[in-house]
Amino acid sequence: MIDINVNNIFFRSYSVDPNSGHAIYVFDSTYLPASDEIGDKQVYDLLINALMDRLVMKLPQAPYSLVIFSSGFSQRKISWVYGIKMFAKLPKETKFYLQKIFIVHESFFVRSVYQVISNAMNFNFLDSKDSQHDFPSLVHVLDLTSLSELIDITRLRISLNVYLYDYQIREHINVPEEYYNRLTPLAIRQYRQLVFDKIFKKLQNDALLCELIFQKPGNYKKVNIFLDIIKRNNYIDLSQWDIYSLASVWLNYFIKNKAKPLIPIELIPLPIVDDLKFTSETFRKIIKFNQYQDLFMVIIPFFNRIIAHGESTKHDSRTLSKALTPALCKEKLSMMTNDRLAIGSRYIKNLLDFFPEIAKEISSPPSSVSSSSTIPVLPKPRKSSPTRYSELGCLTLPRSRSPSPQRSVTSPTYTPVALQNTPVLKPKSSSRNVSSPSFNAKPPLPIKAVTRPQLSLTSNSNTDLALASSSTDTLSSPTKTPSADSLPLSNSSTDLTISDNIKEMVKDEPAKDKNSVETDIFVQQFESLTLVQNAKIKKFDKELQEKKKKNETTSKTADKFSQKGYSDIKASNKVSRLAALYEERLQGLQVMNEMKQRW
């Protein structure tokens, strides 16, 4: 069955037309069904008619601009007749609301339909004097770079199909410099934190079923496109990317680009001893150096789950450690670094093998560290102002004044994490402390999590990790500590609540059609059409599929236009080819006559 989601074809974006202020809608032709996928012309006609009826119902009843990604028409070899039919389906009233059309990746198909409609209806879209009140103005755009100069593309939901087509024209999307200043440093950090969390969540669900994850590289084009999207802080739908590309971005961009390497090779003493004591002592030195303990506590168990599912992932501790070493040790793959990579790979293998015991040793004695002797461990602030210093320790200050025994009981589980290791507050204890009335009495500085703690992306899990990007490591924090890089964006003393606008820009699930009942009916109707018991149609479908396979193997030309002339056609097929062209022309004329009467 062919899955057609109307919400992917026509939808409202978060961007607006900068000139008129009208909302911008998007028509993505790459999601239109191809006639070759259906196999039968009659069924395809019915499908296009039903699809256009659904799209007409979604048209807004207010002025708007429309962005058309037209590459799907040529890629899916949709006949120009269907372009005329789609235009004829539009009600006459829509011309009052549709103000401007941006046609991106214009193809021969779009030019043909535009010329045919213009000649048949005897009007010109670009004539601002005669038809500016009757028909929208057209703006022909070559690629996404040109589109970025007209509207804000960071708020558009651009599909991966469109990005891949645009990549053939230009490998990188060059946007105006002002794009990088539209978000504040806090919003940029929130955006990239959200991308990191969403990718990690997807990896936890899907990586256990993928063979040689983190070893097989992702698609080069897709990875480059993804990195460009992050650089622009663009809207992104993660459901369109394959798991290997996401794993490459997560490991080689977020993890590898942290301010300090997760496994510094310089801190691994030689010779390496493959036992628990040596591995544990070295690990304590490492986390004391980079303060990434909380990150380790989340990603290492995830790596061990990949090893546990070795039947599907084809990984053991040796192969996985070898794949992770360049990113975790922040080393390049070259002949000059082979010795260093061998050291890092051997230690990472031991760390994966002994980590359950190491995690128990590290997390077992938090109660003994909760004494007041841990307070001097914190570095002194740049200024001696107590308000600046209390931003990291603001949750512990009210406890010293409170005589309540109930509050003093809960403080040991919270204080050592906030004071000794700097970042991570457990989600459950964080939610209790925020709701406690003692923290609302005199907060030194307002904390966003107090007002909206429910906006934390992963409030009940430890996947709310530090942002692994070099750009975020330079963000200014109230108190400069060695572990400021490892502070999570939520559930921490400097809690950065992710705003609703930033949340809307990163999606990990495909868009769903709001009219679910109508969608089910539409799918049922289409299924009933495909299940018609007609021997003639089945035979015709089989012949079309055989012709399609034959054409794919014989014709490898990259030209969009056929290299065969009329004399090249076999005598037995000349009549049928001419008949098909003549029938197509008659259908186009019939549709245009009907359109004239309606418009």
Curated annotation (Swiss-Prot):
Residue stretches making up the Rho-GAP domain: 181-359
InterPro entries, alphabetized: CRAL-TRIO_dom (IPR001251), CRAL-TRIO_dom_sf (IPR036865), Rho_GTPase_activation_prot (IPR008936), RhoGAP_dom (IPR000198)
Cell wall biogenesis/degradation is among the record's keywords: yes
Pfam family membership, one: RhoGAP
Residues at the site labelled Arginine finger: Q215
An example Gene Ontology biological process: regulation of cellular response to stress
Biased composition (Low complexity): 363-373, 396-413, 468-483
Coiled coil: none
GO MF term list: actinin binding; GTPase activator activity
Chain segments carrying region Disordered: 362-447, 468-495, 543-563
Keywords of this entry: Cell wall biogenesis/degradation, Cytoplasm
Subcellular location(s) of the protein: Cytoplasm
Any further remark recorded for this protein: Present with 1750 molecules/cell in log phase SD medium.
Functional note: May be involved in cell wall organization and biogenesis.
Protein name as annotated: Protein ECM25
Annotated organism of origin: Saccharomyces cerevisiae (strain ATCC 204508 / S288c)
Gene name for this UniProt entry: ECM25
